[in-house]
From Swiss-Prot:
Residues 45-52 are annotated as: Complementarity-determining-1. Residues 53-69 are annotated as: Framework-2. This is Immunoglobulin heavy variable 5-51. The lineage of its organism: Eukaryota, Metazoa, Chordata, Craniata, Vertebrata. The gene is IGHV5-51. Residues 116-117 are annotated as: Complementarity-determining-3. GO terms for molecular function: antigen binding. Residues 70-77 are annotated as: Complementarity-determining-2.
Length: 117
């Protein structure tokens, strides 16, 4: 096999490795204060139960705030003190999906929310 073919094969393999891990979040929601909300984050391309999944918030014009993390393998969950009791983080390992949930939204919850591995 020529060096060009080996390089092309190596690049194809590396692109596959880089592209396979994905976290796909549910879409934007419009809700009123007092309503409940559950947003999802579906993982693929890796062992979902072997990595922590974190949630962060970005309020308009502000930086990122760490909310909490979950280890889907055993559902071990840790919250930032600022968010403890305000939200619930959970995971369903059978469908490789993590969740961030509010039982009663406030106007101050208006923000962008992101999951990360």
């Amino acid at each position: 096999m020529g060096s060009t073919a080996i390089l092309a094969l190596l690049l194809a393999v590396l692109q596959g490795v880089c592209a396979e891990v994905q976290l796909v979040q549910s879409g934007a929601e419009v809700k009123k204060p007092g309503e409940s909300l559950k947003i999802s984050c579906k993982g693929s391309g890796y062992s979902f139960t072997s990595y922590w999944i974190g949630w962060v918030r970005q309020m308009p014009g502000k930086g990122l705030e760490w909310m909490g993390i979950i280890y889907p393998g055993d559902s071990d969950t840790r919250y930032s003190p600022s968010f403890q009791g305000q939200v619930t983080i959970s995971a369903d390992k059978s469908i490789s999906t993590a969740y961030l949930q509010w039982s009663s939204l406030k106007a101050s919850d208006t923000a962008m929310y992101y999951c990360a591995r």
